[in-house]
A protein has these predicted regions:
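Gly/Ala-rich beta-loop-alpha elbow adjacent to hydrolase catalytic centers
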Residues: 4
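Patatin-like phospholipase
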Residues: 1, 9-218
Length: 218
């Protein structure tokens, strides 16, 4: 879900280096228009308060105006994710999005997708509240974090024997662990920075921190 939907798609198609390059080189200007920067800063301030209710009115206002433009994010997906390659990869891929305004979850894996709608599924799962909803079929979808920001239980339902969950301590709904023996979690040792601020220097710091946090976990 959220940015994890994009990370996971790149990893599932075998492009770990491309995923790292994305984080080490991408800034807000590469993904968002000048007109949307003010609203992004509002999101950063309110998500940092860790309150879903604080976002409600601004999300409503953004969506009434069409939502934050996601065309640059879609362009990145089109340039970097090969639908056929992803679907044929031996690594499975799953995502969650939430239908808007019904707030009903869509949980899908590669077996549920086609080459024509793979990118729609990835973008839908990454469409943070306040972004333009992504259309799949006859429904509009937003970030799956509105339903489950760390879907370890869904992976157990899907048949995984063990789940290693990378936690971000950020936006979204977190459900209780269903099986503590099968689910292990890695938490960041320090704050990661604002959720909607893409900055190469911060990203490189977080990648290094994630490496050491994982090594301690192992």
């Amino acid at each position: 879900v959220s940015i994890g939907a994009i990370n996971a798609a790149l990893l599932a198609q075998g492009d770990c280096e491309k995923a790292a390059e994305f984080w080490e080189t991408t800034a807000n200007d590469d993904l968002f228009s000048e007109e949307d920067k003010g609203f992004l800063e509002i999101i950063n301030r309110q998500v940092n308060l860790n309150t879903l209710s604080a976002l409600k009115e601004n999300i409503k206002a953004a969506l009434e105006n069409g939502g934050i433009d996601t065309s640059k994010i879609r362009a990145f997906l089109e340039q970097n994710i090969d639908p056929q390659r992803l679907l044929e990869s031996p690594i499975d891929y799953g995502m969650i999005a939430v239908a808007f305004p019904e707030l009903q979850p869509l949980i899908a894996y590669k077996k549920d997708m086609t080459p024509e709608n793979v990118l729609d599924h990835v973008l839908a799962s990454a469409s943070f509240p306040g972004f333009q909803p992504t259309v799949i079929g006859d429904k509009k979808y937003l970030d799956g974090g509105l339903y489950d920001a760390c879907p370890y239980n869904e992976l157990l339902d899907y048949g995984c024997d063990e789940v290693i969950a990378i936690r971000l301590n950020g936006f979204g709904i977190i459900h209780p662990l269903r099986d503590k023996q099968k689910i292990r979690q890695i938490f960041p040792s320090e704050q990661l920075g604002p959720v909607m601020r893409f900055d190469p220097a911060t990203s490189r710091r977080n990648i290094q921190m994630g490496y050491y946090d994982t090594m301690r976990f192992m």
